A protein has these predicted regions:
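Core catalytic alpha/beta fold that binds nucleotide/phospho-ligands
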Residues: 1-177
């Protein structure tokens, strides 16, 4: 299960708007009133006793919220935000930096914003805070988890579902004897 929504802030306080949006989404998904929110030791908010996870982010103009049945992180930036090119050397892996350098100069700001929101969303998903940030993760510039929504670039990352591998060969019960 996954749901993503956003609201324009229109002068609303971003924290208030985020909680209102989250409450609305929770009620739409469950038919119940949103439970109280608690924080994990590193500050990641969660619903105690619930299988639903959420993440909220905002820009100057918009608040975004994502809810899923597994750990999730979301981040957004206004496409008009100018980022120092020096940041690329600090947060990008060598592979990411090569992709960034291959982009025409007039598109590099958006490319850096795309990497930035992916890294922020991953950190929020993991709940590790700054310990897992930012160059412990590596992404491709064309990662499909980044999209443009309105005037923003937005990344949503969900934790992978555990994969159970069956490495055993089929056997007969008599083989165990």
């Amino acid at each position: 299960m996954f749901k993503l929504d956003h609201w324009p802030l229109n002068g609303l306080d971003s924290r208030v708007a985020g909680k209102l949006l989250l409450a609305q989404m929770y009620e739409e998904l469950t038919g119940e009133e949103m439970p109280p929110i608690e924080k994990a030791p590193r500050g990641k908010p969660y619903f105690p006793g619930s299988e639903l996870h959420f993440s909220i982010t905002h820009t100057k103009s918009t608040v975004f919220c994502a809810i899923a049945d597994r750990e999730i992180g979301i981040d957004a930036e206004e496409l008009t935000r100018k980022v120092s090119p020096n940041l690329a050397e600090k947060i990008l892996s060598p592979k990411e930096y090569a992709q960034y350098e291959a982009v025409p100069e007039e598109e590099r700001n958006e490319a850096l914003l795309r990497f930035w929101v992916l890294k922020e969303a991953e950190v929020k998903c993991s709940g590790l805070g700054l310990r897992g940030y930012p160059n412990h993760t590596e992404f491709d510039l064309d990662d499909p988890r980044v999209q443009k929504i309105g005037t923003c670039v937005v990344a949503v990352i969900c934790a992978e579902e555990p994969q159970v591998e069956d490495n055993t060969e089929p056997r007969e019960a008599s083989d165990a004897l």
